[in-house]
Each structure stands twice: as structure tokens, then as C-alpha cells.
């Protein structure tokens, strides 16, 4: 009995040794040498895999940089420090990366009176009862549940896309927390209304609206939308504001952040501070700001 056990153990041990030798030989024969710079590039990146660079993850971007398929400086989360470190590894010079944050171009926060009637913000033409997703909602009834076809739908698709908890839904409109935002713009990629754009944090004056409708149409759909009146353009001392397609626009190469435009805007959609500090993300229903969905 003991001899049989020893024989079995010996056979198994021999097979293990043979297989080990075969695997060791195979690893030598089929070994593919990797560039040590790839690991170094990966170490420079934050590892968030946010996709803001256009690649599936940090590893994909690092490999693309190594192969010369992607420029250095596309990692918004890593910022300038990351870009300079990657440039040093690749032996090239990288331009300074300017930090940017996301801006949601909508001022249609819905305000209600004690009776539940809408008194300010984007008007709701129908209550949406479907899947809580902005893309899905935007396809209902032509332009979604809002009267304004340019406004934020407020179902939090951008909130779900953000890996940094930098976006909240406040009174039916997405708001960005500048302190948490890294500028990866993953939120912009999923917004069906294309409302989210990158801006420099130092820019204290922004136009929080994206409506291209004529003034009368905008007013029917939202009490706080841009009507293209041009008052902001007239008061700007630097000629930094133009009105194109019924929407005021700021040329930041001319803007000195004086804020005069905000003082004359009849709709109060020109903000002196483009990003608000918010609490925990809360998604409200379209018609009732107190009801979470």
C-alpha cells in the first residue's frame, strides 16, 4: 500500500517537473520584450481610466504615446505635471497643459411656488416616466419633455459618467463642482444636448445658455434663456461679446472678467462664477424638485 502511494507521488512529482520545464522553455522561446518606458508612462498616469483622452484607459493611452500614435498632454486628470513627466520619459518637450473644468451651458433651474407651479426656469411640456437617462428622454416627443429643445434634461447621464463625483443635478439642471472636476470631459461625451464644454477655471464670466432659438421662442420655453437682445454686447468695453444665431458668445481672448455684461442681462444667465460648490448629487424629477428619482 505504501509503495503504491510513493509511486503515485513520484509520478505526479515527475509530471509536475516535466510540465514546469516545458513552461519555462516556452516562456523563453515565446518571450516578447517590452519597452521599459511603457511601465514608466503608466506610472505617470493617474489610473482613473476615465476615457477623457479618447482611449479605453490609461494603459491604452500610455501605449499610444509610446508608439507615437497620440500626443503627450491629453490626460486632463494628470494635468501639466503628468504631461511633463511623460515628456521627460519620451525625451521630448511638451507644451504646458492648461487646466480646464466642465461648464454646463444651461440656466434653466426649475423653481416652484408653494402650490407646485413652475415660476422660473425651463418649462416642462410633459412628465417623462421612462428610463432615467438623458439620451432616452431626448428621443421622446421629438425633443424630450422640456419645451426648450436646447436645455439640460436633468436625468443625470453626465452624473453617472463622472468618475470624480463632480456633477450634481440641482433643480433639474446639471451643475459642476470645480474642486472635484479634473476636466476629463467624460460628461460632455454622453450629453445628448451637447451642453457641456471645457473652460478655464480663471474665467469668472460665462454665458450659461446654449439656445439658438429666436427670443420669442426661447421665452416660451424657458424664463432664463438667452433671447439675443445684445445688451451684453453693447456694454462690453472690450468688444468681447458677439451675438450669433440668437445666442451671446464671449471671446475670452478679449474678455477681462469685468462682469459688466452680467449686470445688464435681463435673464440673469451670464454668471460671474461659472462653477458652484455643491453637496451630494441629487437627481430631482422634472416636475417636482423635492421628489428624488
Locations of regions flagged by a protein language model:
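Ferredoxin-type iron-sulfur electron-transfer modules and their immediate structural context
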Residues: 3-229, 233-235, 264, 268-271, ...
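Cys/His-clustered metal-coordination modules, chiefly Zn-binding fingers
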Residues: 213-214, 240-247
